């Protein structure tokens, strides 16, 4: 795996890091189970374990570096995965408003090393309900997804595949109460990034 990454570094320096991670199957399964049985709110966030210590160097006998390639500089590592937090439009950004938005699940995780996911939205049409919120089934909610790039939009209900659409927008109608969340995939990316999630949303809870 390391040599695959080294080989692809020159042409695809950012995508090279995709050799070292995969869809977090076990974590997502545990999260889905925790938010479904019984239905309860549990917010997903993500961050980077950045050390800038992956690379190749050639030193002389005195230990002086002759050639060095840093594969994971901090400016690249900190773009691998991000938590995008949604705060009310026009409100002042503060520590308190940031923590409140995160605690409410008004956020989503994205692998921005693939593409900047700013502008993603998962909400209920004709309402103020966004990811992290709940809504009653008898209100006949329509779930709406918007992405900044054309993508494969997958909706997951209670941890199971519910449906998918292609494009920058998608609409899904819940078939019952449950925990609904979104995963988005950039299928046009080459391996090893192909098949890896680009965006993982927090759920909307339909009661």
Language model regions located:
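A solvent-exposed, charged loop/short amphipathic helix patch at secondary-structure junctions
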Residues: 1-19
């Amino acid at each position: 795996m390391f040599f695959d990454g080294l080989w692809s570094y020159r042409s695809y320096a950012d995508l090279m890091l995709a050799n070292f991670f995969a869809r977090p199957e076990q974590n997502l399964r545990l999260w889905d189970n925790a938010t479904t049985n019984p239905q309860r709110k549990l917010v997903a966030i993500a961050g980077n374990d950045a050390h800038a210590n992956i690379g190749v160097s050639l030193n002389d006998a005195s230990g002086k570096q002759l050639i060095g390639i840093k594969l994971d500089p901090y400016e690249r590592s900190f773009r691998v995965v991000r938590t995008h937090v949604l705060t009310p439009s026009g409100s002042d950004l503060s520590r308190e408003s940031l923590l409140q938005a995160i605690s409410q699940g008004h956020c989503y995780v994205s692998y921005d090393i693939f593409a900047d996911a700013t502008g993603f939205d998962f909400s209920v049409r004709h309402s103020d309900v966004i990811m992290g919120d709940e809504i009653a089934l008898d209100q006949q909610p329509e779930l709406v997804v918007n992405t900044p790039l054309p993508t494969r939009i997958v909706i997951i209900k209670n941890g199971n595949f519910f449906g998918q659409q292609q494009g920058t927008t998608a609409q899904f109608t819940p078939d019952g109460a449950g925990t609904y969340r979104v995963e988005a995939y950039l299928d046009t990316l080459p391996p090893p990034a192909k098949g890896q999630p680009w965006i993982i949303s927090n759920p909307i809870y339909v009661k």
